[in-house]
Protein backbone atom coordinates (compact mmCIF):
# COMPACT_ATOMS: atom_id res chain seq x y z
CA UNK A 1 0.00 0.00 0.00
CA UNK A 2 1.23 3.53 -0.75
CA UNK A 3 2.14 5.90 2.08
CA UNK A 4 -0.43 8.38 3.43
CA UNK A 5 -3.22 7.66 0.94
CA UNK A 6 -5.74 10.53 0.98
CA UNK A 7 -9.43 9.67 0.86
CA UNK A 8 -12.89 11.11 1.34
CA UNK A 9 -15.05 9.36 3.93
CA UNK A 10 -18.32 9.38 2.00
CA UNK A 11 -20.80 12.24 1.80
CA UNK A 12 -20.28 15.72 0.34
CA UNK A 13 -22.72 18.62 0.12
CA UNK A 14 -25.05 18.24 -2.85
CA UNK A 15 -25.28 21.06 -5.39
CA UNK A 16 -28.55 22.96 -5.06
CA UNK A 17 -29.83 21.80 -8.45
CA UNK A 18 -30.01 18.30 -6.90
CA UNK A 19 -30.71 18.98 -3.21
CA UNK A 20 -33.66 21.31 -3.89
CA UNK A 21 -35.36 18.73 -6.11
CA UNK A 22 -34.18 15.47 -4.50
CA UNK A 23 -37.37 14.30 -2.76
CA UNK A 24 -39.67 15.55 -5.51
CA UNK A 25 -37.97 13.60 -8.28
CA UNK A 26 -36.38 10.58 -6.56
CA UNK A 27 -36.95 7.44 -8.61
CA UNK A 28 -37.51 9.30 -11.89
CA UNK A 29 -35.37 9.78 -15.00
CA UNK A 30 -34.89 13.41 -13.94
CA UNK A 31 -33.37 12.22 -10.67
CA UNK A 32 -30.99 9.90 -12.50
CA UNK A 33 -29.91 12.76 -14.77
CA UNK A 34 -29.28 15.19 -11.89
CA UNK A 35 -27.61 12.60 -9.63
CA UNK A 36 -25.23 11.68 -12.45
CA UNK A 37 -24.49 15.35 -13.16
CA UNK A 38 -23.85 16.03 -9.46
CA UNK A 39 -21.61 12.97 -9.22
CA UNK A 40 -19.52 14.14 -12.19
CA UNK A 41 -19.25 17.66 -10.75
CA UNK A 42 -18.19 16.27 -7.36
CA UNK A 43 -15.69 13.82 -8.82
CA UNK A 44 -14.07 16.77 -10.64
CA UNK A 45 -13.71 18.59 -7.32
CA UNK A 46 -12.17 15.53 -5.67
CA UNK A 47 -9.80 14.90 -8.56
CA UNK A 48 -8.76 18.57 -8.73
CA UNK A 49 -7.84 18.57 -5.03
CA UNK A 50 -5.50 15.65 -5.71
CA UNK A 51 -7.33 13.06 -3.60
CA UNK A 52 -5.92 9.56 -4.09
CA UNK A 53 -9.27 7.83 -3.50
CA UNK A 54 -12.46 9.63 -4.55
CA UNK A 55 -14.86 7.43 -2.60
CA UNK A 56 -18.27 7.15 -4.22
CA UNK A 57 -18.34 10.70 -5.58
CA UNK A 58 -19.89 12.27 -2.49
CA UNK A 59 -22.97 10.03 -2.21
CA UNK A 60 -25.06 12.11 -4.61
CA UNK A 61 -27.58 9.26 -4.96
CA UNK A 62 -28.19 9.10 -1.20
CA UNK A 63 -30.06 11.58 0.97
CA UNK A 64 -29.02 10.13 4.32
CA UNK A 65 -26.99 7.10 5.41
CA UNK A 66 -29.79 5.32 7.32
CA UNK A 67 -32.79 6.38 5.30
CA UNK A 68 -31.36 5.37 1.91
CA UNK A 69 -31.01 1.63 2.63
CA UNK A 70 -34.03 1.58 4.95
CA UNK A 71 -36.31 2.76 2.13
CA UNK A 72 -35.17 -0.26 0.13
CA UNK A 73 -35.94 -2.88 2.79
CA UNK A 74 -39.18 -4.86 3.06
CA UNK A 75 -40.51 -5.33 6.59
CA UNK A 76 -39.55 -1.81 7.70
CA UNK A 77 -41.89 1.18 7.88
CA UNK A 78 -41.29 4.82 8.83
CA UNK A 79 -43.00 6.69 11.67
CA UNK A 80 -41.40 10.12 11.82
CA UNK A 81 -38.31 12.32 11.95
CA UNK A 82 -35.42 12.02 14.41
CA UNK A 83 -32.59 14.52 14.85
CA UNK A 84 -29.12 13.12 14.13
CA UNK A 85 -26.47 15.90 14.12
CA UNK A 86 -26.06 19.58 13.23
CA UNK A 87 -29.83 20.08 13.01
CA UNK A 88 -30.00 17.26 10.46
CA UNK A 89 -32.88 14.80 10.60
CA UNK A 90 -33.61 11.31 9.35
CA UNK A 91 -36.76 9.21 9.24
CA UNK A 92 -36.48 6.47 11.86
CA UNK A 93 -37.88 3.15 10.75
CA UNK A 94 -39.61 0.37 12.63
CA UNK A 95 -39.01 -3.28 11.80
CA UNK A 96 -42.43 -4.93 11.79
CA UNK A 97 -41.74 -8.11 9.79
CA UNK A 98 -38.90 -10.22 8.44
CA UNK A 99 -36.57 -7.87 6.58
CA UNK A 100 -35.49 -8.41 2.96
CA UNK A 101 -33.96 -6.20 0.28
CA UNK A 102 -36.42 -4.80 -2.25
CA UNK A 103 -33.47 -4.46 -4.64
CA UNK A 104 -29.90 -3.22 -4.57
CA UNK A 105 -29.15 -0.26 -2.31
CA UNK A 106 -26.19 1.08 -4.28
CA UNK A 107 -25.48 -0.83 -7.50
CA UNK A 108 -26.59 1.94 -9.88
CA UNK A 109 -24.40 4.45 -8.03
CA UNK A 110 -21.39 2.10 -7.96
CA UNK A 111 -21.65 1.35 -11.68
CA UNK A 112 -21.88 5.04 -12.61
CA UNK A 113 -18.98 6.15 -10.40
CA UNK A 114 -16.79 3.27 -11.58
CA UNK A 115 -17.17 4.31 -15.21
CA UNK A 116 -16.84 8.04 -14.47
CA UNK A 117 -13.37 8.10 -12.92
CA UNK A 118 -10.08 6.26 -13.31
CA UNK A 119 -9.20 6.95 -9.68
CA UNK A 120 -9.55 4.31 -6.95
CA UNK A 121 -13.00 4.36 -5.38
CA UNK A 122 -14.32 3.22 -2.01
CA UNK A 123 -17.93 2.16 -1.49
CA UNK A 124 -19.47 3.16 1.86
CA UNK A 125 -22.41 1.15 3.15
CA UNK A 126 -24.22 1.63 6.45
CA UNK A 127 -23.36 -1.24 8.77
CA UNK A 128 -25.68 -3.73 10.46
CA UNK A 129 -25.18 -2.55 14.02
CA UNK A 130 -26.02 1.07 13.18
CA UNK A 131 -29.04 -0.01 11.09
CA UNK A 132 -30.26 -2.02 14.08
CA UNK A 133 -29.52 0.69 16.65
CA UNK A 134 -31.26 3.39 14.64
CA UNK A 135 -34.41 1.30 14.07
CA UNK A 136 -37.32 0.40 16.33
CA UNK A 137 -37.65 -3.37 16.73
CA UNK A 138 -41.25 -4.55 16.63
CA UNK A 139 -40.63 -8.03 15.23
CA UNK A 140 -37.41 -9.80 16.25
CA UNK A 141 -36.66 -11.31 19.66
CA UNK A 142 -33.78 -9.02 20.59
CA UNK A 143 -31.21 -6.54 19.30
CA UNK A 144 -28.66 -9.22 18.46
CA UNK A 145 -31.11 -11.08 16.23
CA UNK A 146 -32.12 -7.88 14.43
CA UNK A 147 -28.48 -6.84 13.89
CA UNK A 148 -27.70 -10.25 12.41
CA UNK A 149 -30.68 -9.94 10.06
CA UNK A 150 -29.43 -6.56 8.86
CA UNK A 151 -26.01 -8.20 8.45
CA UNK A 152 -27.58 -10.89 6.27
CA UNK A 153 -29.11 -8.44 3.82
CA UNK A 154 -26.02 -6.19 3.78
CA UNK A 155 -23.99 -9.28 2.94
CA UNK A 156 -26.36 -9.91 0.02
CA UNK A 157 -25.76 -6.33 -1.17
CA UNK A 158 -21.99 -6.68 -0.94
CA UNK A 159 -22.03 -10.01 -2.76
CA UNK A 160 -24.03 -8.43 -5.59
CA UNK A 161 -21.46 -5.62 -5.86
CA UNK A 162 -18.63 -8.14 -5.70
CA UNK A 163 -20.13 -10.25 -8.49
CA UNK A 164 -20.33 -7.25 -10.85
CA UNK A 165 -17.05 -5.61 -9.84
CA UNK A 166 -14.79 -7.50 -12.31
CA UNK A 167 -16.84 -6.07 -15.20
CA UNK A 168 -16.63 -2.42 -14.05
CA UNK A 169 -13.41 -2.23 -12.02
CA UNK A 170 -10.98 -1.37 -14.83
CA UNK A 171 -8.34 -3.25 -12.83
CA UNK A 172 -9.00 -1.48 -9.52
CA UNK A 173 -9.31 -3.44 -6.30
CA UNK A 174 -12.69 -3.52 -4.60
CA UNK A 175 -12.75 -1.29 -1.51
CA UNK A 176 -15.70 -1.41 0.90
CA UNK A 177 -16.21 0.84 3.93
CA UNK A 178 -18.70 -0.29 6.58
CA UNK A 179 -20.12 2.84 8.25
CA UNK A 180 -20.81 2.17 11.93
CA UNK A 181 -21.17 5.48 13.82
CA UNK A 182 -23.18 3.71 16.53
CA UNK A 183 -20.36 1.25 17.31
CA UNK A 184 -19.46 2.33 20.84
CA UNK A 185 -22.70 3.99 21.94
CA UNK A 186 -23.68 0.91 23.99
CA UNK A 187 -20.46 -0.46 25.54
CA UNK A 188 -22.15 -3.69 26.65
CA UNK A 189 -23.10 -4.52 23.03
CA UNK A 190 -19.64 -4.81 21.49
CA UNK A 191 -20.28 -8.55 20.98
CA UNK A 192 -23.22 -7.60 18.74
CA UNK A 193 -20.99 -5.19 16.80
CA UNK A 194 -18.35 -7.86 16.19
CA UNK A 195 -20.82 -10.61 15.29
CA UNK A 196 -22.90 -8.49 12.92
CA UNK A 197 -20.02 -6.73 11.16
CA UNK A 198 -18.24 -10.04 10.57
CA UNK A 199 -21.45 -11.59 9.24
CA UNK A 200 -22.03 -8.67 6.87
CA UNK A 201 -18.61 -9.08 5.19
CA UNK A 202 -18.56 -12.89 5.11
CA UNK A 203 -17.26 -14.14 1.75
CA UNK A 204 -16.28 -10.66 0.53
CA UNK A 205 -12.85 -10.43 -1.13
CA UNK A 206 -12.06 -6.71 -0.86
CA UNK A 207 -10.14 -4.17 1.16
CA UNK A 208 -12.55 -3.78 4.06
CA UNK A 209 -12.56 -0.77 6.36
CA UNK A 210 -14.74 0.32 9.26
CA UNK A 211 -15.69 3.98 9.71
CA UNK A 212 -16.59 5.18 13.20
CA UNK A 213 -16.98 8.80 14.34
CA UNK A 214 -17.78 10.73 17.53
CA UNK A 215 -17.14 7.70 19.69
CA UNK A 216 -17.37 7.96 23.46
CA UNK A 217 -14.36 5.68 23.78
CA UNK A 218 -12.45 4.22 20.85
CA UNK A 219 -10.68 1.83 23.21
CA UNK A 220 -13.87 -0.25 23.24
CA UNK A 221 -13.33 -0.71 19.50
CA UNK A 222 -9.56 -1.15 19.65
CA UNK A 223 -9.93 -4.03 22.12
CA UNK A 224 -12.03 -5.92 19.56
CA UNK A 225 -9.78 -5.35 16.54
CA UNK A 226 -8.29 -8.89 16.77
CA UNK A 227 -11.82 -10.33 16.39
CA UNK A 228 -12.99 -8.13 13.51
CA UNK A 229 -12.28 -9.34 9.96
CA UNK A 230 -11.50 -5.79 8.89
CA UNK A 231 -8.37 -4.48 7.14
CA UNK A 232 -8.43 -0.93 8.46
CA UNK A 233 -10.27 1.75 10.43
CA UNK A 234 -11.25 5.25 9.21
CA UNK A 235 -11.82 7.29 12.35
CA UNK A 236 -12.56 10.80 13.61
CA UNK A 237 -9.92 12.62 15.66
CA UNK A 238 -9.82 16.33 14.74
CA UNK A 239 -13.19 17.20 16.30
CA UNK A 240 -11.71 16.45 19.73
CA UNK A 241 -8.36 18.13 18.99
CA UNK A 242 -7.09 21.70 19.40
CA UNK A 243 -6.20 24.00 16.50
CA UNK A 244 -2.84 24.84 18.09
CA UNK A 245 0.27 24.11 16.06
CA UNK A 246 2.75 21.56 17.38
CA UNK A 247 3.47 17.86 17.68
CA UNK A 248 3.64 17.65 21.48
CA UNK A 249 1.07 15.63 23.43
CA UNK A 250 -0.41 18.80 24.92
CA UNK A 251 -1.06 20.22 21.46
CA UNK A 252 -2.63 17.04 20.06
CA UNK A 253 -5.11 15.81 22.72
CA UNK A 254 -7.51 14.51 20.08
CA UNK A 255 -4.99 11.96 18.83
CA UNK A 256 -3.84 10.49 22.15
CA UNK A 257 -5.67 7.19 21.92
CA UNK A 258 -3.88 6.31 18.67
CA UNK A 259 -1.14 5.16 21.05
CA UNK A 260 -3.48 2.43 22.28
CA UNK A 261 -4.52 1.54 18.73
CA UNK A 262 -0.84 1.09 17.91
CA UNK A 263 -0.29 -1.14 20.96
CA UNK A 264 -3.10 -3.42 19.82
CA UNK A 265 -1.94 -3.31 16.20
CA UNK A 266 1.64 -4.19 17.10
CA UNK A 267 0.37 -7.39 18.76
CA UNK A 268 -1.20 -8.59 15.49
CA UNK A 269 0.52 -10.76 12.93
CA UNK A 270 -1.29 -8.93 10.12
CA UNK A 271 -1.29 -5.18 10.78
CA UNK A 272 -4.34 -2.98 10.20
CA UNK A 273 -4.21 0.46 8.60
CA UNK A 274 -5.77 3.50 10.20
CA UNK A 275 -7.48 6.31 8.32
CA UNK A 276 -6.88 9.36 10.49
CA UNK A 277 -9.40 12.22 10.56
CA UNK A 278 -7.20 15.30 10.11
CA UNK A 279 -9.95 17.85 9.35
CA UNK A 280 -13.09 18.59 11.39
CA UNK A 281 -16.28 18.34 9.33
CA UNK A 282 -18.49 20.12 11.87
CA UNK A 283 -16.87 23.56 11.65
CA UNK A 284 -16.30 25.98 8.78
CA UNK A 285 -12.76 26.68 9.98
CA UNK A 286 -10.42 25.61 7.17
CA UNK A 287 -7.47 23.95 8.84
CA UNK A 288 -4.17 25.53 7.74
CA UNK A 289 -1.79 23.20 5.94
CA UNK A 290 0.70 23.48 8.82
CA UNK A 291 -1.89 22.30 11.37
CA UNK A 292 -2.73 19.26 9.25
CA UNK A 293 1.00 18.56 8.79
CA UNK A 294 1.47 18.62 12.57
CA UNK A 295 -1.42 16.21 13.07
CA UNK A 296 0.05 13.83 10.49
CA UNK A 297 3.54 14.07 11.99
CA UNK A 298 2.15 13.40 15.46
CA UNK A 299 0.52 10.20 14.20
CA UNK A 300 3.72 9.14 12.42
CA UNK A 301 5.63 9.56 15.66
CA UNK A 302 3.39 6.77 17.00
CA UNK A 303 2.81 4.60 13.91
CA UNK A 304 6.21 4.42 12.27
CA UNK A 305 5.09 2.88 8.98
CA UNK A 306 3.40 5.57 6.80
CA UNK A 307 1.89 2.82 4.64
CA UNK A 308 -0.32 1.93 7.63
CA UNK A 309 -1.70 5.49 7.77
CA UNK A 310 -4.38 6.96 5.50
CA UNK A 311 -5.67 10.54 5.71
CA UNK A 312 -9.29 11.65 5.59
CA UNK A 313 -11.76 14.13 7.05
CA UNK A 314 -13.33 13.05 10.34
CA UNK A 315 -16.55 12.09 8.59
CA UNK A 316 -18.55 12.97 5.48
CA UNK A 317 -18.45 16.64 4.47
CA UNK A 318 -22.14 17.03 3.65
CA UNK A 319 -22.65 19.46 6.56
CA UNK A 320 -20.23 22.00 5.05
CA UNK A 321 -20.56 24.05 1.86
CA UNK A 322 -18.99 22.59 -1.25
CA UNK A 323 -16.36 25.34 -1.36
CA UNK A 324 -15.32 24.82 2.27
CA UNK A 325 -15.30 21.05 1.81
CA UNK A 326 -13.11 21.42 -1.26
CA UNK A 327 -10.59 23.63 0.54
CA UNK A 328 -10.40 21.27 3.51
CA UNK A 329 -9.60 18.39 1.15
CA UNK A 330 -7.11 20.48 -0.84
CA UNK A 331 -5.19 21.49 2.29
CA UNK A 332 -5.16 17.87 3.44
CA UNK A 333 -3.54 16.78 0.16
CA UNK A 334 -0.97 19.60 0.26
CA UNK A 335 -0.10 18.69 3.86
CA UNK A 336 0.31 15.03 2.91
CA UNK A 337 2.69 15.92 0.07
CA UNK A 338 4.74 18.19 2.33
CA UNK A 339 5.06 15.50 4.99
CA UNK A 340 6.11 12.91 2.42
CA UNK A 341 8.87 15.26 1.24
CA UNK A 342 10.03 15.74 4.83
CA UNK A 343 10.24 12.01 5.59
CA UNK A 344 11.63 10.85 2.24
Swiss-Prot record:
Cofactor note: Binds 1 zinc ion per subunit.
Matches recorded under InterPro entries: Met_Synth_C/arc, MetE_arc, UROD/MetE-like_sf
CDD domains assigned to the protein according to its UniProt record, in alphabetical order: CIMS_C_terminal_like
The keyword NADP appears for this protein: no
GO BP term, example: methionine biosynthetic process
Pathway: Amino-acid biosynthesis; L-methionine biosynthesis via de novo pathway
EC number: 2.1.1.-
Keywords: Amino-acid biosynthesis, Metal-binding, Methionine biosynthesis, Methyltransferase, Transferase, Zinc
Coiled coil: none
The keyword Cytoplasm appears for this protein: no
Name of one Pfam family that matches: Meth_synt_2
Cofactor(s) named in the record: Zn(2+)
Binding site for Zn(2+): 211, 213, 236, 315
Molecular function per GO: 5-methyltetrahydropteroyltriglutamate-homocysteine S-methyltransferase activity; zinc ion binding
Task of the protein: Catalyzes the transfer of a methyl group to L-homocysteine resulting in methionine formation. The physiological methyl donor is unknown.
Similarity remark: Belongs to the archaeal MetE family.
NCBIfam families: PRK01207.1 (NF002272)
Protein name: Methionine synthase
Source species: Thermoplasma volcanium (strain ATCC 51530 / DSM 4299 / JCM 9571 / NBRC 15438 / GSS1)
Phylogenetic lineage: Archaea, Methanobacteriati, Thermoplasmatota, Thermoplasmata, Thermoplasmatales
Protein's gene: metE
Amino acid sequence: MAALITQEIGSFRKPEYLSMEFHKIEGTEKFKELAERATIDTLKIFENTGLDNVGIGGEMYRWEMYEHPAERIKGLIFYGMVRSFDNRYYRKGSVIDKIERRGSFHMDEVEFVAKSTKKPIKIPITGPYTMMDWSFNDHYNDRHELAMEFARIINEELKEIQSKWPYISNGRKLEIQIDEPATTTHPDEMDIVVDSVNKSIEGIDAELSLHVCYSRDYRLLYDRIPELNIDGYNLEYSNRDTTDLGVEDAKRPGFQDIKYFNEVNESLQRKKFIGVGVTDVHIDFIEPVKLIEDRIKYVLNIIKDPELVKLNPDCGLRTRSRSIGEQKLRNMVIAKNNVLKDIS
